[in-house]
């Protein structure tokens, strides 16, 4: 069984890593807060490492899933860093929803040591991760992806080679900007309908049989806004980061993007208002506060 390392046992990282605990791999995990790695290892029969270097030693594939590309880059250096543990010929697969420029810089640094890099952000949420049915969007060269496939297949159902390093991050950011637009526009529309006396269940019943429907209207709003549950599965802080990446990417490509830029401003303000622990769908609460009513 070849060893494989997974670093970053957060809301989505932990259920992804669980799929690597299978007969094909000898899983070793590392997490910034060591108690989480120890608990994960004990519950899943994996080993846990004290440092990124220790986790990476002897592994052909090292997977990271951290908040941003910046945290990934910060794990590379020092005596305990990934570069101290990763061998020539090994691969870093970064499942963070990262930014293309930092991923390219990280790939270049790794290439100097003969180490491959793939940006491989995922979509499908915590539910998709638990079910092993994530979509994985990969940037990097095809031969490197081929070698990483056995690992990606454990938690991914649809694995798409998107282009060179940074392409996976770019597609993920554009997808996230669309998710953010859907949340905000449906929140505004539903609040107006609610104020006009239309029941939210009735509004969603119509919208979900019509051309405005989306994952937000079909799943997120019925489960979270109507039920006022707002489970914390994907942080508002992270979608704020994603929309910023999209806004930056569109500016770099010289695409006039007023909608994406405004969405980035709205989510940055919502993040500032609701704090670090709020879930992304809770952005609707800002619309409700400024609109002076609740969607009900
Ligand atoms: P969480 O905030 O739940 O977890 C973040 C993880 O990163 C934790 O393991 C945390 O360690 C670690 N971490 C944070 N800062 C540092 C640091 N400076 N150095 C080392 N480790 C650090 O995030 P998620 O798991 O939700 O998200 C991870 C990535 O996946 C993000 O890029 C996100 O956008 C993306 N994603 C998330 C989805 C979701 O549904 N949650 C869906 C699709 C993509 P510690 O335990 O010590 O805090």
In which residue ranges do the predicted regions lie?
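NAD(P)+-binding Rossmann beta1-loop-alpha1 motif at the extreme N-terminus of oxidoreductases
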Residues: 1-64, 90, 95-96, 126
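Rossmann-fold NAD(P) dinucleotide-binding segment
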Residues: 52-116
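Active-site-proximal catalytic alpha-helix in oxidoreductases
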Residues: 131-132, 136-139, 160, 164-196, ...
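Rossmann-fold dinucleotide-binding core
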Residues: 4, 66, 97-177
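Interdomain hinge/lid region at the active-site interface
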Residues: 178, 214-280
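NAD(P)-dependent dehydrogenase/reductase Rossmann-like domain
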Residues: 272-296
């Amino acid at each position: 069984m070849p060893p494989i390392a997974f670093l970053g046992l957060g809301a989505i990282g932990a259920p992804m890593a669980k799929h690597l605990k299978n007969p094909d791999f000898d899983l070793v995990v590392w997490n910034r807060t060591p108690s989480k790695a120890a608990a994960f290892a004990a519950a899943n029969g994996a080993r846990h490492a004290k440092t990124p270097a220790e986790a990476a030693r002897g592994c052909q594939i090292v997977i990271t899933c951290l908040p941003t590309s910046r945290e990934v880059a910060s794990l590379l250096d020092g005596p305990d860093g990934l570069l101290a543990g990763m061998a020539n010929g090994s691969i870093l697969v970064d499942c963070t929803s990262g930014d293309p420029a930092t991923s390219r810089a990280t790939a270049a640094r790794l290439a100097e040591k003969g180490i491959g890099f793939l940006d491989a952000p995922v979509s499908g949420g915590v539910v998709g991760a638990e079910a092993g049915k994530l979509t994985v969007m990969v940037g990097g060269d095809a031969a490197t992806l081929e070698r990483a496939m056995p690992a990606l297949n454990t938690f991914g159902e649809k694995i798409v080679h998107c282009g060179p390093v940074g392409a996976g991050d770019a597609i993920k950011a554009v997808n996230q900007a669309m998710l953010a637009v859907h949340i905000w526009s449906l929140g505004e529309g539903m609040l107006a309908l609610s104020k006009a006396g239309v029941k939210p269940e009735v509004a969603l019943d119509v919208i979900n049989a019509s051309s405005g429907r989306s994952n937000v209207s079909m799943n997120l709003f019925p489960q979270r806004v109507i039920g006022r549950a707002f489970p914390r599965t994907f942080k508002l802080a992270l979608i704020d980061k994603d929309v910023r990446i999209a806004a930056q990417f569109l500016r770099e490509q010289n695409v006039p993007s007023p909608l994406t830029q405004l969405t980035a401003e709205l989510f940055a303000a919502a993040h500032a208002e609701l704090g670090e622990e709020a879930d992304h769908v809770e952005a609707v609460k800002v619309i409700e506060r400024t609109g002076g009513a609740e969607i009900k």
